[in-house]
Amino acid sequence: MPFEDAVESLADTLRVRVSEPTARRQTERWGAAYVGVQEEEVKRIEQELPLAPAGTDKMLLSVDGAMVPLVGGEWTEVKTLVLGAIGEPEWEGGEWKVHASELSYFSRLMEAESFGRAALGETHRRGVETASQVVAVTDGALWEQGFIDYHREDAARILDFPHAAEYVAQMGSAVWGDETATTKEWLSKQLHTLKHEGPKDVLSELRMLVQDHPELPELSESLAYLEKREAHMQYPMCLAQGWPIGSGAVESGNKVVVEARLKGAGMHWARDNVNPMLALRNALCSGRWAEARSQILTHQHLQVLQTRQLRRERRLTEQATALAATKALPSTQIAEPASETPVPQLSPSTDTHPSNASGPNKPREPWRPSPHHPWRHSPIGKARYRRRSHPPSAGK
């Protein structure tokens, strides 16, 4: 869901209003935190080498790439891993088909070698190492084979049947033309043989086309691609084992997990923001949103504590450095005042108050005004009139 739609949905359902830039920043912040959680899990596995949990009896492993647009008109490949439990074959449309359930996804924008290491947390969690059988269905790209070697070297490798059919169809179209009756009839026969009898007779037919049409160099290129992957086209054996022969799970993952959110109309992403968005999409589409939310909040809380601890250690280090530098100075430099103006020193025998000249230990008495001080003659607090005293009369 684009950020604009998410903001409107939040306002309509919860009556909470936030701006689109705020929604974008918070989403990218949460995504970056979840990327950090998954990276820490990879480091933990590499350091502690814990036992892998039990995997399923038959596990599907499929990897593929999808292109997403970046800012500036550039396009780049996002790699996606899909893991799932292979179910029992089901009769559909006149043939047996195999489906996988409990699908989980891991997607990243990075080089193939780094992607293989980054996916270690997901493959360990799903028990790829301990699964009885791992079936790896891919389009045959070299980086995909390296990924399989890293996580489960003994996995049964299958070239996606529609991908093989595409190369066969290209050769028929080059000889007889696109969508002609001859091409359709020839292609139908070759694909039926490839699925139910194996690649041997089909490759022989394709070699004859190359010999008969040396003027078409594209035939040799398609044939070389298929010959190199002959061991991965044993489709009759795969069907007998109940294994899938198509990479529909990862192709669907490319569309639903990656392209539905990052390849919309008018969307262009900064490279640094692609993996945070992919991490959140993986959590949502794998049914782990509640778990991811808890891990993200814990990770952010720990980051705050670590930042505080680093600041405290830096402050203590600066204080210790300043104290050590002060102790290293000569005593004369420490005693000198900062100002060059000399400060007059009072002699111990000098007293600024003459009333205390009798000795330094005599306590200072409170100051009292003299009898003739104007305060003594103030009428305030005194009777304004006094009764006059008369002398006694002489006759009495």
How would you name each of these model-derived features?
Residues M1-K396:
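Catalytic center-proximal scaffold of phosphoryl-transfer enzymes
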